[in-house]
Amino acid sequence: MKKQLVLFCDFDGTITENDNIIAIMKQFAPPEWEALKDDILAERLSVQEGVGKMFSLLPSALKDEIVDFLLSTARLREGFREFVAFTKEKGIPLYIVSGGIDFFVYPMLDGLIDKERIFCNGSDFSSEMIRITWPHACDGKCQNGCGCCKPSLLRKLARPDGYHVVIGDSITDLAVAKQADYVLARDFLLKKCQELDLPHAPFTTFFDVVDHLQRLEVIA
């Protein structure tokens, strides 16, 4: 009996061509954000702590301006719309698992992905500065302070009959890639999959992703 494909797809740098949090910080944040970014990359700060501190540098009044900026500048990776159509046609569950924030992830995926299939961090604009909330924080098996914990989400959403495929690009996708049955990877994640000998294939566009999925024998 063939297994059911279940897809877990990253957002920043995977669905979009660039990292949207970095784009926001470069455009709107004071210089202090750079040190926070470096501390995250050096693992001196958890992603949850670092991203929370970065957004706390931004006034809540900037919300609409930030969304307008991203909607006018961010680009979806080539073939993404066709990829979404392919998953719907084949009845393949597709979950977006993102370290991004709801106030920009939802508008950018509006009309493509239902909100209940998007798992990302939340936001609170009721105070002077933006506050990030963490509805998908680490479960009892993860202590990494992920923010939006992708390994926890895979454990929660996995199916007994599932063949779980992770699609991603960066360090924040590595832990969940290690749990997956198969990985479609680019950039940093591709190098790590090669180093760790994880079952994987490279992709550049989402047309490549569809080609790889069609070749996987688990497709009914």
From Swiss-Prot:
Its EC number is 3.1.3.87. The keyword Signal does not apply. InterPro entries: HAD-like_hydrolase_phosphatase (IPR050849), HAD-like_sf (IPR036412), HAD-SF_hydro_IB_MtnX (IPR017718), HAD_hydro_PyrdxlP_Pase-like (IPR006384), HAD_sf (IPR023214). GO terms for biological process: L-methionine salvage from methylthioadenosine. Disulfide bonds: none annotated. It catalyses: 2-hydroxy-5-methylsulfanyl-3-oxopent-1-enyl phosphate + H2O = 1,2-dihydroxy-5-(methylsulfanyl)pent-1-en-3-one + phosphate. The keyword Phosphoprotein does not apply. GO terms for molecular function: 2-hydroxy-3-keto-5-methylthiopentenyl-1-phosphate phosphatase activity. CDD domains: HAD_Pase. SUPFAM superfamilies: HAD-like. It is an enzyme of class 3 (hydrolase). Belongs to the HAD-like hydrolase superfamily. MtnX family. HAMAP family: Salvage_MtnX. This is 2-hydroxy-3-keto-5-methylthiopentenyl-1-phosphate phosphatase. The gene is mtnX.
